[in-house]
Amino acid sequence: MANRPPRIYVLAGTNGAGKSSIAGAMLRETGADYFNPDEAAHRIRSADPRMTQADANSAAWHQGRRLLERAIADRLDFAFESTLGATTIPALLASAASLRIEVRVWYVGLSSPELHIARVRARVAKGGHDIPKPDIRRRWETSRLNVIRLLPRLTELRVYDNSGDADPDTGATPAPVLLLRVRRGRIVAPRDLSATPAWAKPLVAAAMRLDAATRRRPA
């Protein structure tokens, strides 16, 4: 820790993207304190079964915000999940970057808000918690916009597509596809961006603009 800046890892994406299943384990392996709001909401509601799911979600969100604020103030490594669908968390991340804290975002997306809704519905059928459809549709737009706004401040951005469906016979889930990796303003992968799906094109376009601007800067 003494030899490098503190790091904040953000596993981001609209509800139903499959964030935890893709990279939750990898984030835990970073050694940073890791906060999963879904797990926190479950613990909160288990402790008080009279609490509604919405109230538990809200309490978990506020808990995560406080932990992020503490990590920034104390310059600690921290990892957490977020939809990045509103304004508070992106503003805190921008503040962290201005304080020379490395902010690394791994963003997981699906091809459409309707697929996010279907994945959440499948999760509910297995006992998971629900998210209102209007919230999912709104976050599908705003989360990507927030990533684009944050991009010039990020140490690293990875974008994954998790739209592939499980095999109906085996149940095997296809591996998520890495669509984009940007490090310190430069695109480092993949070499060919021509197959970028429509939902991720705004992110790739923003990364290409940043890459061009970064390369024009004097060394």
Located regions from the model:
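Short hydrophobic/aromatic beta-strand immediately N-terminal to the Walker A/P-loop
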Residues: Y9-V10
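P-loop (Walker A) phosphate-binding loop of NTP-binding proteins
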Residues: T14
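A glycine- and Lys/Arg-enriched "phosphate-lid" helix/loop adjacent to the NTP-binding pocket
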Residues: L99-V147
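Glycine-rich phosphate-binding loop used to anchor ATP phosphates in small-molecule kinases
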Residues: A56-V108, S143, L150
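Phosphate-binding P-loop
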Residues: M1-P6, A71-I72
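Conserved substrate/cofactor phosphate-moiety recognition/catalytic segment
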Residues: S21-L76
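Conserved glycine(s) of the Walker
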Residues: G18
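NTP-dependent small-molecule kinase module
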Residues: L150-A219
